[in-house]
Structure formats: structure tokens, C-alpha cells
A protein has these predicted regions:
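Short, charged helix-capping/linker segments at alpha-helix termini
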Residues: 1-11, 21-41, 51-57, 140
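Short, small-hydrophobic-rich alpha-helical interface motif
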Residues: 20, 24, 35-46, 66, ...
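Arg/Lys-rich amphipathic alpha helix in sigma70-family domain 2
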Residues: 48-55, 65-86, 96-97
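DNA-recognition helix of helix-turn-helix
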Residues: 68, 72, 136-160
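Short helix-coil-helix linker/hinge
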Residues: 98, 108-116
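A short pre-motif secondary-structure segment
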Residues: 118-122
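Short, basic, alpha-helical segments at the C-terminal edge of helix-turn-helix-like DNA-binding modules
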Residues: 160-168
Length: 168
């Protein structure tokens, strides 16, 4: 890669890596190691195609699409691979917000990967149904039905006390 292109890529990484990590963290249901792996793999793939990516309408949207597809691909492959036996505490501050965040991440972690991706794109990233469908290679009606089903599942997992936090 030429020096100017490398500089562009490094600037892109500096501005987008945190947002990609936040999305990866939600997709990974709080698994920080998986989130870091997803971001690293995404940025590696973007780097390989940087000349084309830099000329795209939205390199950030391209990277987000790569992130989601990498997550879904990894989930398909890991179904027979390693199995985590639990998470060690981060040592992060605890409190009501932390407990709520962990409860929500646990509920998201119990969803199938594609449902989790639909919820991430629709409600975390605030993407349209059409944009979500394009990123996941689904029809718009599939995004609507999977989103509705996933929200219902999250409501059921959260129980009566927290289900009002889930969008309708």
C-alpha cells in the first residue's frame, strides 16, 4: 500500500475502531476477547481491500457490514469449536447500571447470532430495515420478523420487571 493510502487507513482506524469495538462487544454478548478478535479480523479485511473501500460511499458502513458478517461466519464455524466455561469478573465498578447492562448482555447472548445481529443493527446502530436487510443479505420481511421474534425473546428472558426496557 502506498504511504498516502496507509495514512488514510490509519486515520480510518483511529476514528472508527472504538465504534466497531462497541458493536462487536454487543454482538459478542459482552465477551471482550471475542469482540477484540472481531475488530481485528474486520480491520484486517478492510486493510486488504482498502483501495476499493476508501473509494466507497461509506467506508464506515462497509466496515460495519464486514464486522457483522465476520461475526455470523465465526458463529457458524464455532458451533463445533471451543466452548467458554464462564467469564471472569472485569473488576469494573458495580451498581444498578452495571447489573442492567450485564442482564441485557446475558439475554442477548442467549439469542441466535443472526437475531443478535438484527437487534444490534436495528436498535444499537439505528439502521433502517432495508439497510439491515442489505447488510445481512436478508429480505426486509425477514428482518422485520426476526427482529420481532428476537425482541419477544429478550422480553421473555428479562421477565416482567425489565421487559419494559425492550422496544415494542
Amino acid at each position: 500500500m502506498k504511504s498516502a493510502q496507509e495514512d488514510e487507513y490509519l486515520e480510518f482506524v483511529a476514528t472508527r475502531a472504538k465504534a466497531l469495538y462497541r458493536s462487536a462487544y454487543v454482538l459478542a454478548a459482552g465477551d471482550t476477547h471475542l469482540a477484540e478478535d472481531l475488530v481485528q479480523e474486520t480491520l484486517s479485511r478492510v486493510y486488504v481491500h482498502w483501495k476499493r473501500v476508501a473509494g466507497a460511499d461509506s467506508p464506515a458502513a462497509y466496515a460495519q457490514t464486514v464486522l457483522v458478517r465476520t461475526f455470523l461466519s465465526l458463529r457458524r464455524r464455532r458451533s463445533t469449536g471451543e466452548r467458554p466455561i464462564g467469564n471472569l469478573p472485569d473488576g469494573a465498578a458495580s451498581g444498578p447500571d452495571t447489573a442492567l447492562r450485564l442482564t441485557l448482555l446475558d439475554a442477548l447472548g442467549q439469542l441466535p447470532p443472526r437475531d443478535r445481529a438484527v437487534l444490534l443493527l436495528r436498535y444499537w446502530e439505528d439502521r433502517s430495515i432495508e439497510e439491515t436487510a442489505r447488510m445481512l443479505r436478508l429480505s426486509s420481511s425477514a428482518v422485520r420478523s426476526q427482529g420481532t421474534r428476537a425482541l419477544g425473546r429478550v422480553r421473555a428472558l428479562l421477565g416482567d420487571s425489565l421487559s419494559d426496557l425492550v422496544p415494542h
